[in-house]
């Protein structure tokens, strides 16, 4: 770090701005940074590109905020204060929130399937009863109460191949209803993203502290910002890639909706395992 300090004092800081962005990109590719959890979360909720961008930016925002809090707080609290000393506590807090999110995803999927099944069964039975004898009454009576069945069977004729697939179409409509972004609010997405970025980056904290000690506060802030931009590019790319993959799979693979009904279970289990690992790692770091 001595050479780095010398270069800063010589006025060669402009060279480090693009380098900081590149390092942020590479740093985001390292293990961790919640890339696995973000991708699993986007796949589980069948998220849009907009939601993926929001998730990545939220993770970057919290990651940057933690760097500033630790660097500035450490200067005033104790000279022996380091990123390594506070990291286990942040990991433990993150693990608790992540495990709660995994449990919420699992419970939400199970409840959605149970409620969807309860709503579909009487609707299907009544529909088959009235379709043949009271076609006009069906349009009038069920427009409000069983809209999801009306949509899924729209334009079907008795005996057609589409009619035989009506049950599968009803399932597809139910998937779209359950995983529409109205059920997963922007606040929940932001909370998950903010949680994923709580783990601090010792390298970024060290650079910021050096800049502050050299009375180059503006430069330090700029470099941390550039580092965060690079990190955001990686995290957003991961989320957008997951969102596009979900959309393309839904268009090109007829069996995707069947898999999508079970995907949230696997995603919540995967997120839960990551949370457990993070919690154990944080706990072991605390007791050492």
UniProtKB/Swiss-Prot annotation:
Q: Which residues lie on this side of the membrane: Periplasmic?
A: 1-12, 73-85, 210-223, 288
Q: Which residues form the signal peptide?
A: none
Bilayer topology annotation: Multi-pass membrane protein
Asked if the keyword Transport belongs to this entry, the reply reads yes
User: Which residues lie in Basic residues bias regions?
Assistant: 125-137
**Induction field:** By nickel and cobalt. Transcriptionally repressed by RcnR.
Q: Which UniProt keywords apply?
A: Cell inner membrane, Cell membrane, Cobalt, Cobalt transport, Ion transport, Membrane, Nickel, Nickel transport, Transmembrane, Transmembrane helix, Transport
Q: Which GO terms describe its biological process?
A: cobalt ion transport; response to cobalt ion; response to nickel cation
Residue ranges spanning the membrane: these are 13-33, 52-72, 86-106, 189-209, 224-244, 267-287
Give residue spans on the Cytoplasmic membrane side.
34-51, 107-188, 245-266
Its subcellular locations are: Cell inner membrane
Its chief place of residence is: membrane
A Pfam family (short name) is NicO
Summarizing the function annotation, the protein's role is: Efflux system for nickel and cobalt.
Q: Which family does it belong to?
A: Belongs to the NiCoT transporter (TC 2.A.52) family. RcnA subfamily.
Q: Which PANTHER family match?
A: NICKEL/COBALT EFFLUX SYSTEM RCNA, NICKEL_COBALT EFFLUX SYSTEM RCNA
The protein in question is named Nickel/cobalt efflux system RcnA
Question: Which species is listed as the source?
Answer: Citrobacter koseri (strain ATCC BAA-895 / CDC 4225-83 / SGSC4696)
Where is the organism placed in the taxonomic lineage, from the top?
Bacteria, Pseudomonadati, Pseudomonadota, Gammaproteobacteria, Enterobacterales
What is the gene name? rcnA
């Amino acid at each position: 770090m001595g050479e780095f300090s010398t270069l800063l004092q010589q006025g060669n800081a402009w060279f480090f701005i693009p380098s900081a962005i590149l390092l942020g990109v590479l740093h985001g590719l390292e293990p961790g940074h919640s890339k696995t959890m973000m991708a699993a979360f986007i796949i589980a909720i069948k998220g849009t590109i907009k939601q993926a961008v929001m998730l990545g930016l939220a993770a970057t925002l919290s990651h940057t905020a933690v760097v500033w809090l630790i660097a500035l707080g450490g200067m005033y609290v104790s000279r022996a204060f380091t990123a390594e000393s506070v990291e286990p506590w942040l990991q433990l807090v993150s693990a608790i929130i992540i495990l709660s999110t995994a449990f919420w995803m699992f419970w939400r999927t199970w409840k959605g399937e149970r409620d969807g099944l309860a709503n579909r069964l009487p609707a299907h039975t009544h529909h088959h009863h009235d379709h043949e004898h009271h076609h006009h009454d069906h349009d009038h009576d069920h427009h409000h109460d069983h809209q999801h069945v009306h949509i899924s069977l729209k334009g079907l004729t008795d005996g057609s191949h589409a009619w035989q697939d009506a049950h599968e179409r009803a399932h597809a409509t139910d998937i779209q209803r359950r995983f529409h972004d109205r059920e997963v609010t922007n606040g929940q997405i932001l909370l998950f993203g903010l949680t994923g970025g709580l783990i601090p980056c010792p390298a970024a904290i060290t650079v910021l502290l050096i800049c502050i000690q050299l009375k180059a506060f503006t430069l330090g802030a700029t470099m941390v910002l550039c580092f965060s931009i690079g990190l955001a590019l990686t995290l957003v790319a991961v989320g957008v890639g997951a969102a596009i993959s979900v959309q393309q799979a839904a268009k090109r693979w007829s069996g995707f909706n069947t898999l999508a009904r079970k995907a949230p279970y696997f995603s919540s289990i995967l997120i839960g395992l990551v949370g457990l690992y993070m919690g154990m790692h944080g706990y072991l770091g605390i007791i050492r």
